Amino acid sequence: MHYLLEKGDIEVLKEHISLYDEELTRIDESRYSDNPIVDSVLRTKIGAARAEGIQINTSIRIPKQMQLEHGDIGVLYGNLLDNAIEACRKVEIERRFIKIENKLTAGKMLLIIENSKTGEKNESLTTTKSDNYSHGRGIHSVRRVVEKYSGTITFTDKGKVFEVSAMLYGIEVKE
């Protein structure tokens, strides 16, 4: 694809991307919400989670279009789910789970993600990866998105379960 882009062959590139997109859709056509951007991120992350033997439970009630920028959707869902998957990897396979709840009412969007984890505490929410220079920026990015929408975010360690709860304000349904 990079070659086609550098060559400037946009029409062939569009065709190539269209075929690739069709193939991805055939692989996982799951709909988790009415929002195609959220679903795209969720399909990718849920697919990765299931490949790790993680049980997934979703309850998502958000509209097809809302006043939340696409990039912010990727940052919010992507980083939080990456962290949940990482925590689940450290747990025995039969205990691995991620629960995603998401709803939009009266201009407020609530996103709650719970996941299994070891009993170990990580009070500072710092990365546990050995290469902490390249990792650990996700929570900072998530906080920026939450602040952008005048929201709040809480991280709760419940022992062998971790919960992130984010509330964003001013998220209206687009017509």
Task: Tell what function each PLM region has.
Residues 93-107:
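Short beta-strand/loop element within the Bergerat-fold HATPase_c
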Residues 49, 85-93:
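A short, flexible helix-to-loop-to-beta junction within the catalytic ATP-binding CA
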Residues 18-22, 34-51:
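Short beta-to-alpha transition helix within the HATPase_c
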Residues 107-140, 175:
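Glycine-rich/acidic phosphate-handling loop/turn and adjacent ATP-lid/helix
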Residues 30, 56-77:
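Conserved short strand/loop->alpha-helix "switch" segment adjacent to the catalytic nucleotide/phosphoryl-transfer site
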Residues 119, 158-165, 171:
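Glycine-rich nucleotide-binding loop
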Residues 150-160:
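Glycine-rich ATP-binding loops of the HATPase_c
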